[in-house]
Amino acid sequence: MQRSLSHIIRLNKTLLLLTKIENGQFPENSTIDLRAVVQEQTDLYNEIYASRNLSCYVNISGEFTVKMNESLASTLINNLLKNAFIHSEAGSKIIISMQDQTLTISNDGTKQLDATQIFNRFYQGEKKEGSTGLGLALVKAVCRYYHLNLEYRFNKDRHYFSVTWP
């Protein structure tokens, strides 16, 4: 009962956030150091998923600052990282790279996802317990809000999610 209630509350909060993004209710932008956001959230996920023995490599060359709402920048990075950590098998590798205004997060995988569906609300290629199916929809909403290019590709048993700033 408690788990179901918690899931419904999280689902409701996420849907409200999606609606706020789509309605343009995040006008305050500031200069965000994405390197710091990525490093902070990567450290957090490494701690949370330490028991799964995932190898996470961060390759950030140079400065990477953008003009965004701080909350939305965090939402974007958080959901991309969470997706990689949740959908990686124990002992596998996650690679995060930032260069030339592009952030790419990749993780091991065995089969390509449906690129026409993965960013849609409630789509779940492989159902994971506790998942709302809204994480990548949030990523898509933030990218659309800021006119960022969002791309998914699968190559040599790896999933690649890339966001490029103009």
Summary of predicted features, one role per range:
Residues 91-102:
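Short beta-strand/loop element within the Bergerat-fold HATPase_c
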Residues 3-8:
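Short alpha-helical segment of the dimerization/phosphotransfer core of two-component systems
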Residues 147-155:
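Glycine-rich ATP-binding loops of the HATPase_c
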Residues 84-85:
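Short helix-loop "hinge" at the ATP-lid/N-box region of the Bergerat-fold HATPase_c
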Residues 111-124:
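Short conserved segment of the HATPase_c
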